[in-house]
């Protein structure tokens, strides 16, 4: 989790206070992960132990889309195939082309561009 987060922060240069969503996974127990968040003024956010899907609806929705639109459509034989499939889905489709009703039917990249240029 830390390597892609470092890459995202380096490329996107988020404003201080950006909330990073998690599900209380192993990354939240990692001192390196927590230190990276702190050093970059990022705020950890994760669901409670007895969470409902509403607590982290955006992340739950993303995972549902990833499964339906990508993973269930392919037979993955190894880690490299899985990594490539997921990377391409996120970078080439989900962020750049897939429209989202929650952001005025824009793709995440188009929405971010609109916000930055406002």
For the regions a protein language model found, what residue spans apply to each?
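Charged DNA-binding/catalytic regions of mobile-element recombinases
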Residues: 1-118
């Amino acid at each position: 989790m830390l390597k892609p987060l470092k890459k995202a922060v380096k490329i996107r240069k988020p404003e201080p206070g950006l909330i990073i969503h998690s599900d209380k996974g192993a990354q939240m127990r990692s001192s390196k992960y927590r230190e990276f968040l702190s050093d970059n003024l990022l705020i950890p956010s994760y669901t409670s132990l007895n969470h409902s899907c509403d607590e982290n609806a955006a992340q739950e929705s993303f995972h549902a889309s990833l499964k339906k639109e990508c993973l269930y459509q392919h037979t993955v034989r190894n880690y490299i195939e899985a990594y490539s499939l997921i990377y391409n889905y996120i970078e080439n489709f989900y962020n750049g082309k897939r429209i989202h009703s929650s952001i005025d039917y824009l793709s995440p990249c188009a929405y971010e561009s609109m916000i930055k240029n406002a």
